[in-house]
Amino acid sequence: MAAAIADLPLIASGKVREIYDLGDSLLLVASDRISTYDVVHPTPIPDKGAVLTGLSTFWFEQTGGIVAGHLESVAEGVPDEVRGRAMKVRKLRMLPVEAVVRGYLSGSGWKDYQATGAVSGIELPAGLRESDRLPEPLFTPSTKATVGHDEAIDFDGAAALIGDRALAQRIREASLAVYRHCAEHALARGIILADTKFEFGLDSAGELTLGDEVCTPDSSRFWPVDEYEPGRGQPSFDKQFVRDWASSTGWDRNPPAPPIPDEIVARTRAKYLEGYELITGRPFSEWLARTGAHD
């Protein structure tokens, strides 16, 4: 289901995105595909690619004063057939670490804590419950697995992979600063940004630059504030909804992933759109109009 664009060289096709070469820049195209447990389902979620792109654009524009971002344009230089779900971005030398930040104890962080009392080697107070807010946001990096699952590592492991401890420290500081900014904004809009992951690279001048996507439903856990209750898993505006459904089917998390029923597709699309409009304060139709996308 890769998006074919005439005359543009396809550099990479991932679980959700295609990357095309524009010469001096790249074209990052978000599809409507959805993956859980690192496996892509055969059923797309309509408008998901446009929601991811619109939210990333919003956050890149919000956080440019914290760290440079790779976004160049969402309209100029973007082919008509992918407008709304594509970004023209700077070429970067990507760094081999997923920069994960956790503000709340959930997912693999909660499992780590239950087993060891720590997350990514960072000791935490005893007695924390699932979904509790952490005393401070934590930088809990992971590897970037080309096949299979990313693996959690500690800061020393991240610094070793990057090969430059000072650069790893800058990534940690930038990740925490961007997370805090986005989490504060989201909270004022009624959404808890529980955790997220970033990717960084170096531009042609060696400047640390935020790449990929920023605080989207695919890279983050978004929880509604008015339903937040520590001690359990939380309802969400992200793909946790599909993860929960997939887990309930008895699927063993190995390919192929099961098709997603129409009702789950419709509810997931509605969650994505609701999250977009709450966070940005703008109707989704405005994003489609801004980019010249076909509604």
Language-model segments: residues:
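Active-site loop/lid in soluble adenylation, ligation, and acyl-transfer enzymes
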Residues: 1-145, 252-259, 263-295
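Short, active-site-adjacent segments that bind or coordinate small-molecule cofactors and metal centers
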Residues: 90-92, 188-196, 201-203, 269
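Conserved metal-phosphate-binding beta-hairpin within the catalytic cores
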Residues: 101, 193-214
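A short mid-domain helix/strand-loop element embedded in enzyme catalytic domains
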Residues: 133-165
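A long amphipathic alpha-helix within ATP-dependent nucleotide-binding catalytic cores
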Residues: 162-194
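C-terminal helix-cap and adjacent tail motif
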Residues: 214-275
